[in-house]
Amino acid sequence: KKTLSLEKGLAVDTFQTHLKFGWGDKNFFLRTKEWSDMEVGTVLNTVFGRGPGAMHLILCTPKDLDPKSMVEVKVSKSQYQRLCAFIQCSFRFENGKAKMIEHHPYGTYDFFFDSPIEYNMTYTCNTWTNNALKRAGQKACVWTPFKGAIFSKYAVRSSQK
């Protein structure tokens, strides 16, 4: 049985009630905590190269969430289970446990895990998100390396407000 073992491996307190998942280029994650940390070599390798992927988990509070950069997606129980299965397949497991990346420049509530999925210019973080939505039976693009196309699927038209 594969498990993320989050309840034993993450520093949790009573204020961190939400968990954000993301997938992306491992080297970019580990070298670019802030946009000001960005280096030309890292960007070029991320855009034009191929490299290992990583999962990024962030424990947060509701006030840490920016509603302007989020959309609500309602899912059924079976859609939720399919989404969780997709996310779980994005972790590399060793001896049944997700392989955590121990050293990174982020904070106490950030966690990184190795992923078996390779990052490249045709499979980006936005492609991963789009595929997660597809797996959950939600609106998604045929393919997208950019977030704008995904968000446009969930845009509220002025006539619907």
PLM region spans:
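Glycine-rich catalytic cores of cysteine/serine-nucleophile enzymes that process amide/ester linkages
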Residues: 1-74
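Second-shell loop/turn segments in exported
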Residues: 66-76, 111-120
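Activation targets extended, charge/polar-rich intrinsically disordered C-terminal tails
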Residues: 89-161
